[in-house]
């Protein structure tokens, strides 16, 4: 687990809310505080879909919604002349991207052992921070996955031109 302070909040928010930078991540939850509090649970509501629609949903056993699909709604909540007083967005890597990361390391884990590889994005008092986290459904003292995920996020941000400290 690492905590990264984003150096240019405005550029980061553009990547988060306008550009496609984070579109392949899944949304676990979002809390946005403007004139009132808005909370989004990113878990997909199975009852909303017909059986046919459900069958067309792909990947990740469709437990969580893609950020791509919820991003416009979140953006609509905060656009305007005033920034939110605070915002927390929790995302996780897709199963496909998690499998790709696992294939690059020797952690002795499978995606069945992983509840999620998370990034917690927090905006408050004009600053944006990202905190990484891993959740396993088995006990392990091995921190290989944690280290690899932390490195992945640092490289991901750097490749997008998002500076941090």
Show which residues each predicted segment covers.
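Charge-rich, low-complexity N-terminal segments
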Residues: 1-69
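Context-gated lysine
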Residues: 7-10, 19, 33, 71, ...
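Surface-exposed, low-hydrophobicity interaction/linker segments
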Residues: 59-127
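Generic "edge-of-domain/loop-turn" microfeature
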Residues: 27, 31-32, 37, 96-98, ...
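Mixed-charge, glycine-accented linear interaction segment located at domain edges/termini
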Residues: 128-165
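Phenylalanine-focused residue identity feature
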Residues: 12, 22-25, 48, 73-75, ...
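Short, surface-exposed, charged/polar-biased interaction segments
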Residues: 30-34, 43, 110, 138, ...
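Generic alpha-helix detector with strongest preference for long hydrophobic helices that associate
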Residues: 3-6, 25, 70, 119, ...
């Amino acid at each position: 687990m690492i905590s990264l302070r984003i150096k240019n909040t405005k550029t980061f928010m553009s990547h988060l809310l306008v550009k496609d930078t984070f579109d392949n991540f899944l949304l676990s939850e979002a809390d946005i505080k403007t004139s009132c509090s808005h909370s989004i649970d990113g878990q997909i509501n199975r009852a909303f879909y017909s059986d046919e629609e459900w069958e067309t949903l792909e990947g990740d056993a469709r437990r969580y919604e893609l950020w791509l699909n919820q991003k416009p709604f979140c953006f609509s909540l905060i656009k305007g002349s005033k920034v939110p007083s605070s915002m927390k967005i929790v995302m996780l890597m897709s199963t496909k991207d998690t499998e790709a990361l696992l294939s690059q390391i020797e952690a002795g884990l499978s995606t069945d052992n992983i509840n999620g590889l998370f990034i917690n994005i927090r905006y408050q008092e004009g600053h944006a921070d990202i905190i990484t986290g891993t959740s396993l459904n088995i006990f392990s003292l091995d921190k290989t996955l944690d280290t690899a995920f932390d490195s992945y996020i640092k490289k991901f941000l750097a490749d997008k031109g998002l500076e941090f400290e």
